[in-house]
Amino acid sequence: KYHNPHFIGNRSVITHLMEWKYDDIGDECERFLGPYGYGGVQVSPVNEHAILDRRPWYERYQPVSYDIRTRSGDEQQFRRMVKRCNKAGVRIYVDIVLNHMTGAQSGKGTNGHHYDGNTLQYPGVPFGPNDFHGHESCPTQDLEIHDYTNPKEARNCRLSGLRDLKQQSEYVRQKQVDFLNHLIDIGVAGFRSDASTHQWPDDLRSIYSRLHNLNKEFFPENSQPFIYHETIYYGGNGINSNEYTSLGRIIEFRFYKEITNVFRGNNPLHWLKNFGTEWGLVPSGDALVMIDSHDLRVGHTGKLGFNINCFEGRLLKAATAFMLAWNYGVPRVMSSYFWNQIIKDGKDVNDWVGPPSDKNGNILSVHPNPDMTCNHEWICEHRWREIYNMVKFRMIAGQEPVHNWWDNGDYQIAFSRGNRAFIAINLQKNQQNLQQKLHTGLPAGTYCDIISGNLIDNKCTGKSIHVDKNGQADVYVGHDEFDAFVAYHIGARIVS
């Protein structure tokens, strides 16, 4: 029901433009995301939130009201962005925080509303003490979650001190329904549901059952919102991400975990031959997948040193390329900003650092440079050639199955997607090149490697490859090359 992302045409990839301003996202939809084939943007939470010391990124995950006003802009700017992006063929998915309000502090939110997390007063909604879980429903002494595998505790107690809303209450549900319907009426395509694991599936079902159909100005009649859930599997039998697959897709954390394990060199690459449901993952149609996220990059989920983020560009590009080449789930590409990563005792002491901003905390605008990089400290992974060209690869591969699998029994693999696209990856540990005559599945001709370059005016700015009449080619990926993979598709054929 809530599984369709409503991509336009054969677009198939979402990017998370973390903490970008709405005006900048609108520009990016028109100037880059639309033309380069991205299907949608996940935007950071849009509702009024707490203003915390030092302005950390996670203040956006501490709601104060459901008014649309954040550091990214106000409701008018948000509406304009949604319209511009839809027109450019790019959908908008809003990160929604329904599980809780703020932490214990009191103060003012980004739309000027006062709140008090100690007395549980949020007049901007309004919510009061009766709208939160207390000792009557949370089994722990301090109202905090300690045992994440106990459903009652994980869903009725406080996640890291955040005030836990009583979603069994009709009043609370209706306030949340009104907020989501307001966003739907503006023209969003759906939502990332934050902390779904900590909300009862039946409460979410009740809320979703009242959602409007998507706005007919941008979507076909009777379209339902796309919803994908942050479901972190804590082990134990208590909570299972499968409880949420009737409510939308789940963010399949096992995908990130298994792929990272392989690309870190803990498991051989050739194991990925049957990667997917046979590994215990949910069916492809129930999954949204990622390599990196706003949490993973700083170790708020997973482990630092294990997670792959923008500081390991070569590895991140290779793992992302596999994700985009493999026919599983809806992939999401992280787009982050620079922070000074300092790891002490397995923790990043700067894991709180917010987006590039001026001394008054105003987020700085993104102005891409002619070479596709971004200004200030915006990293813009979604603009890296290796990534945007793999977005195109996925578009061209469409629903074609994986064919022509080859591996060396270790850390070199290659496969095609039907007869439309082909990729080869070399992560061999002992400085070994991948040099092999392989079946590419491609029609005869000369192809431009879309990883080392682009095809511009029928000329390749990178390496090229010749495919013979049998679909075979001499494939080469040196162990010390800038990128650990090559990729070809029928849209990058050099016409002779």
From Swiss-Prot:
Modification note: Disulfide bonds are present.
**Enzyme active site:** D194, E230
Read off the SUPFAM superfamilies from this record: (Trans)glycosidases, Glycosyl hydrolase domain
Cite the entry's keywords alphabetically: Allergen, Calcium, Carbohydrate metabolism, Chloride, Disulfide bond, Glycosidase, Hydrolase, Metal-binding, Secreted
Q: Name one GO molecular function term.
A: chloride ion binding
Q: Name one GO biological process term.
A: oligosaccharide catabolic process
**Which cofactors must be present for this protein to function?**
Ca(2+); chloride
Q: Which InterPro entries match?
A: A-amylase/branching_C, A-amylase_C, Alpha_amylase, Glyco_hydro_13_cat_dom, Glyco_hydro_b, Glycoside_hydrolase_SF
Its EC number(s): 3.2.1.1
Q: Which Pfam families match?
A: Alpha-amylase, Alpha-amylase_C
Q: Which of this chain's residues are annotated to bind chloride? A: R192, R332
Q: Which reaction does it catalyse?
A: Endohydrolysis of (1->4)-alpha-D-glucosidic linkages in polysaccharides containing three or more (1->4)-alpha-linked D-glucose units
Q: Name one GO cellular component term.
A: extracellular region
Write out the annotated subcellular location: Secreted
How is this protein activated or inhibited?
Inhibited by alpha-amylase inhibitors from wheat and rye. The most effective inhibitors are the wheat tetrameric alpha-amylase inhibitor (WTAI) and the rye dimeric alpha-amylase inhibitor (RDAI-1). Not inhibited by alpha-amylase inhibitor from barley.
- Where along the chain is Ca(2+) bound? N99, R155, D164, H198
Which superkingdom? Eukaryota
Listed Gene3D superfamilies: Glycosidases, Golgi alpha-mannosidase II
Where in the chain are disulfide-linked cysteines found? C29-C85, C374-C380, C448-C460
How are cofactors bound according to the entry's free-text note? Binds 1 Ca(2+) ion per subunit.
Transition state stabilizer, annotated site positions:
D295
Instruction: Relay the pH-dependence remark from the record.
Output: Optimum pH is 6.4.
- Subunit structure of this entry? Monomer.
Describe its function.
Aids in the digestion of starch and glycogen derived from food, such as skin scales, fungi and bacteria.
- Family membership: Belongs to the glycosyl hydrolase 13 family.
Instruction: Specify the protein name.
Output: Alpha-amylase
> What organism is recorded for this protein?
Dermatophagoides pteronyssinus
